[in-house]
Amino acid sequence: MRRGGWRKRTENDGWEKWGGYMAAKVQKLEEQFRTDAANQKDGTASAIFSGVAIYVNGYTDPSAEELRNLMMLHGGQYHVYYSRSKTTHIIATNLPNAKIKELKGEKVIRPEWIVESIKAGRLLSSAPYQLYTKPSAAQKSLNFNPVCKPEDPGPGPSNRAKQLNNRVNHIIKKIETESEVKANGLSSWNEDGVNDDFSFEDLEHTFPGRKQNGVMHPRDTAVIFNGHTHSSNGALKTQDCLVPVGNSVASRLSLDSTQEEKRAEKSNADFRDCTVQHLQHSTRSADALRSPHRTNSLSPSLHSNTKINGAHHSTVQGPSSTKSTSVLTLSKVAPSVPSKPSDCNFISDFYSRSRLHHISTWKCELTEFVNTLQRQSSGIFPGREKLKKVKTGRSSLVVTDTGTMSVLSSPRHQSCVMHVDMDCFFVSVGIRNRPDLKGKPVAVTSNRGTGTAPLRPGANPQLEWQYYQNRALRGKAADIPDSSVWENQDSTQTNGIDSVLSKAEIASCSYEARQVGIKNGMFFGYAKQLCPNLQAVPYDFHACREVAQAMYETLASYTHSIEAVSCDEALIDVTDILAETKLSPEEFAAALRIEIKDKTKCAASVGIGSNILLARMATKKAKPDGQYHLQPDEVDDFIRGQLVTNLPGVGRSMESKLASLGIKTCGDLQCLTMAKLQKEFGPKTGQMLYRFCRGLDDRPVRTEKERKSVSAEINYGIRFTQPKEAEAFLLSLSEEIQRRLEAAGMKGKRLTLKIMVRKPGAPIETAKFGGHGICDNIARTVTLDQATDSAKIIGKATLNMFHTMKLNISDMRGVGIQVNQLVPANSNLSTCSSRPSAQSSLFSGRPHSVRDLFQLQKAKKPTEEEHKEVFLAAVDLEVSSTSRACGLLSPLSAHLAASVSPDTNSGECSRKWNGLHSPVSGQSRLNLSIEVPSPSQIDQSVLEALPLDLREQIEQVCAAQQGEPRGKKKEPVNGCSSGVLPHPVGTVLLQIPEPQEPCNSDSKISVIALPAFSQVDPDVFAALPAELQKELKAAYDQRQRQGEDTTHQQPTSTSVPKNPLLQLKPPAMKDKRNKRKNLIGSPRKSPLKNKLLSSPAKTLPGAYGSPQKLMDGFLQHEGMASERPLEEVSASTPGAQDLSSLLPGQSSCFRPAAPNLAGAVEFSDVKTLLKEWITTISDPMEEDILQVVRYCTDLIEEKDLEKLDLVIKYMKRLMQQSVESVWNMAFDFILDNVQVVLQQTYGSTLKVT
C-alpha cells in the first residue's frame, strides 16, 4: 500500500495540513501535558519513564487516561497523536493484521509493562511485554486472503448482507484450518486469529462509510481512540463474546479430523451469532454519545486499520479526554451525528445519545418499578429489619453540624417526608472511579477539547447571542439584530485558525466548578474561559442507569411509598418507617445516605420536612452531601427568607410579574391577601402561591401519575434538501411514536405536528454545529376518528398536516410529533360498548376538566348529523334529549339522557338562551337539571348497564311519564327559581312530575324542551310510534294553552347567570331591551330562535307559510302557537325572563341584550377578558368554553360576523401562545361548533388562517 495513498483519498477532509493547524495543536497538547504534570506531581512522583514517550492505540487496561496520569507522575511523555520520530513505544492490547503490517517493526508493548515497572521502581525491559514479535522467514503465519483495496468500489446494497456472511464464514474456515499462530512465542487464537483478519476494514467494505458531519471519511481512515472506550466501572469486553468456546489452537490440534470439522461448523455458527448479537447490541446501546469529531470503539477486534506513519491521526480533540462507555455501532463506529436525517438509523442514534431522552426514559422505568413493587408487595422490608437491629445498639446521641452533641428527641408519629437527591449526579457517576478528579472543577459535556470549535462559514454566534439576550428582556417580541453591525466577538485566533467558543452544553458540573460561576446548561466554551482548569468528562449512561437503579432499590428496601421525581431524586413518605423502627428522622436519613454511598460510591443529600414543599427546600440547605431536618417550629422563620423562585411553579414569567409587585421573598409574598393574588394570577395559581409562601402543602407522595401525552421531537441535525426527505423522516418519526405508544400500553386520538423553521433574517448556519438556531415554532393539530397506535395512521395524518404548512424545506430545523388524549391500548372509546361508562363518568357529580368534554365530543365519528347532536349534548347542560328526538335523535344523545339521574335541586338549574344553557357555578358543572326522555327514546342496553338504584329511578320516571295527566298546568317549586327558565320561542315543554307525588302540584317537575313543530320532518314524525305521537301532540296542545294564559303577562328581566371563572369584570346589567322591526308575514331572521343548529328557512322552506301541508289538525295548533308567547311564568320564579315573539299584528317584541361575554360587549373589553382568562388559567373548565361558544353563536344571530371573525382570530393567537396543549384543544372545540352554526345558517364557514 502506498504511503501517500491515504493523503490522496482524503485531500478534501481538512486534516492533511500537518504543518499548520495539526502541528500547532500537537505542540499545544504537549505543553498542556507538561503543565499538568507539574501540577500533579507530589511525593509519589518519580522519573522511571524519563525519555519514554508512549502512544495508546485502542482499548487497554489500564485505560488511556490512567496511563496518561501514570506517565505524568513518573516522568514520561504521552502522545495523543502518533509520531514516528518522537513516539518511542506504542501501547496496545490487540491490533489487527493490517496495523501490524504498517508498524514495520515498531515496538508495540502491552500496558502491563508500565504497571509492573512502577511496581518494581525501575524501568523494566520491554522485550517480554511486546505484543507481537517480527516473524522470521521460517515462522509459519496465517494465509490471509487479500482484502479489497480502499480505492475499489464497495459492494452494492443488495449484496451487502450476503457478502458479510460469506466473509465471516471464510475467515472462520481459515482460522479453523491453520495449525498454529505465533505471537510472542505463544499460541493464542484470541490475539492473532479473528482479530487480525476480521477487522473493521472488512465491515467497512461491506457497509461503506457514510458522511460524518458533512465530510466523507475514507474506509481506511484511522480513528484512534487512545483507550477512551473503556469504562472503569464495567465496560463490556466483547472479545470474550467473539471467541467461541474451545477454539484454542492447542485444543484444536488434538482433535481428529472428524471432530475438527464438527467443531468448525459449530464455531462458525457460534461466532456468527455472537458477532451479530454484538453488533445489534452496539447499535442499540445508549452509551454512544460523543462529540462530533469523536468516534469510539469498544471491542479491540473491531478497530479500524490505522497508518502509523504520520498520515493518519486521531480525531480526539484534547488531552483532557477521559474514559467513556461508548459502544461501537456497525455504521462507521457510531458517528456522533449521522450524516443525514434521512438515514434509517438517524432517529435511533439521536435518542441513544440524547441525555434528556435517557432521563425521561429512566423516570418512566423507575415509576413502573415502584408501581410493580406496590402491586407485588408482601409487606416485608429488609431495610427496616436492619434498622431495628442497629437501633438496639446505638446511642441516641448524634453529632450536629456544629460538632456539639445533642440528644435526639423521641420520634413523634407525625407526617414526615424525605427528599433524596444525588449530588451532581452525572459528575458524581463520571468520577466515582476517578480519584484524581475529586475536589477539582469537573463538568460533564460532549466536548473534551480546549473549549473552542472551528468557525463555520455563514455562522454568526454573536448575533444569536444578542438575539437571545433581547428575548430574555422583551420576550417573543424580540427582533433579530442587524447582522451587518455584529462581528464575531467571541472568536479567537488559535494557531492561525479562526475558532469560536464551543457551544457544547454542560449537563452537570461539580461544586468546585460552581464556585467560580459555572452553571448547569452553560456552554462549555464560556465555562472554560471562567475556569481554564475545568476538566471535562464524558457521559456514562450505562453507569448512571446502574446508580439510579441502585438508589431506588435501596429506597424500596425500606418503603414502597416512593414518588419517582427523576433518575437521581425521589420523594418518600417515612412516617410508617419512623413509627415502626422508633428512629428519629435524622437517624434514618443518616443510615440511608450511608447505604446509598456504599452501593453507588456517590453522595446523596436528604431534606426532611412535614410536607413535600418543606422537604425540597430543606434539601437545598442540606447540599452538598448532607442532611437537614426542617422542624415545624422553624418553618415560619425559614420560609420568610426563601426567594419566591424557590417555590414550585414560579418561573421567569411569574418571577418578573412578582418583581413588578415588589415581591422577592416569601415574606414579601405573605403580605398579599389571597384575593389580591387570585386577582393577579388567577384562582388556582393565586391560592397555590398563598399556601406555598406559608409552607402549606397538602400534596401527597404520589406513586402513580397519569400519562398525558407521548411525543418524539428532534431539533438537532435536522437539515433537509428535498420534500421527500422530510416526508420520509416524518414516517420514521411516526414509527418511533408507535414504539413509544406500545411501550406505554396507550393509544392516542389527537396528533400535533410541531415544526421549527428558521426565522427570517437568522443566519443559515447556526452557531452550534447541527443546532436549530433562531427559529419560529409552527404547530398543527388534528383529531383522529379513533384512538390509535398505528404508525401508518399517524404517519398519514402527519403528512397531511405537513403539506398544509407549505414550508421551505431547507429552513426546517426541528420536527416533533405529540399524541394526546391517551387511552389504554386494551380499550376502545369509539365502540358502543364502551360509551355508557365513559359518558356516565362525565355525570358522576365530580368536577371535570375540559379534556373530559372533548373526550365526550369525540366519542362518535362526527358525521354532520352526529356532530350536531354531540355539540348539543355538550352545550345543553340539561341534556334535553327529547328536544332532539324529533330531529332524528342520535344514539349518543339517548345514551347521555339515559345515564343520568332526573333529580333536580335549586342549585342545579340553568338558563337557556337560544338553545344554549349558561352554567351557574364551577361547582355544579354537568351536574345540573338532567331530564329523562320519553320511554321510546331510551336504549334498553344502556338502561340495563346502569346501577340498580339509578335504573329504578329512571323506570319510575318513565312510568310517571306514561301516566301523566295531559293538559294540566304544572308549576316548578322547591325554590328552584331558575329551574324553569324561559326558552326560546318555538320550544315546547314536556313537564313530568316526580313519581313520589304524581298528583301534587307542589312536586318537582322535570322539563323537557322540544323544538317548534316547524322543525319536525313529517317523515320522521310519521315514523314515530303512535304512543309518542300522542305524547308530542299533547305537549304542543299544552303549549298552545299556556300561550293563551300568558299572552297578557309582561316580561321581566334578569341577568344571565355568570361563571365565576369568567367574571373577571362586573357585567353591566341591562334592563332595557332593543326593539325589533315588525316581522309580520316574514320568517324569523335566525334559526337560533328555534333551534341552534337547524335552519327552518333552508330545511323546511314551507313550514311557516303553509303549515297545513305537513299534518292537518295537529299543525293547526302549531301554526297558531308558533307566533305566540311560549313561556310559563310562575309566581315562584320572579327572576324568570319571557323571551316571546309577537303575535301577528303586534309591532315590536322584546329580545335579550346585545351579545356579551360575562358582561363585556365592546370588542376591546372582550379581548381583555379573553386574555386574562387564557393567561391565568392552565386548565379551562367546560362551562367557560361553553359560555364562549354561546357568545359566538349570539354574534352569529346578530349577524355581527365581523366581530365574530376578530374574536375567533384573537382567541387563536392567544391559545396558540399558551404552553398548555389543552388550550389548542379548547380553541378547536370552539371553532368546530361555530363553523357548524355558520354552515347551517349561511351555507359557508369562516376562513381562519
From Swiss-Prot:
One of its GO terms (molecular function) is DNA-directed DNA polymerase activity. Residues 44-131 form the BRCT domain. Residues 253-323, 1035-1109 are annotated as: Disordered. Residues 350-360, 651-654, 707-715 are annotated as: Interaction with target DNA. DCTP binds at residues 355, 421-425, 508-514, 520, 568. Residues 1150-1249 are annotated as: Protein interaction domain. Mg(2+) 1 binds at D421, D568, E569. Residues 417-651 form the UmuC domain. Residues 294-319, 1048-1057 have a biased composition (Polar residues). Ubiquitous. InterPro entries: BRCT_dom (IPR001357), BRCT_dom_sf (IPR036420), DNA/RNA_pol_sf (IPR043502), DNA_pol_Y-fam_lit_finger_sf (IPR036775), DNA_pol_Y-fam_little_finger (IPR017961), HUWE1/Rev1_UBM (IPR025527), IMS_HHH_1 (IPR053848), REV1 (IPR012112). Mg(2+) 2 binds at D421. Keywords: DNA damage, DNA repair, DNA synthesis, DNA-binding, Magnesium, Metal-binding, Nucleotidyltransferase, Nucleus, Transferase. GO terms for biological process: error-prone translesion synthesis; response to UV. Its main location: nucleus. The C-terminal domain is necessary for protein interactions. PANTHER family: DNA REPAIR PROTEIN REV1. Interacts with FAAP20. Monomer. Interacts with the DNA polymerase zeta which is composed of REV3L and MAD2L2; the interaction with MAD2L2 is direct and requires that REV3L is in its closed conformation. Interacts with POLH, POLI and POLK. Belongs to the DNA polymerase type-Y family. This is DNA repair protein REV1. It comes from Mus musculus. The lineage of its organism: Eukaryota, Metazoa, Chordata, Craniata, Vertebrata.
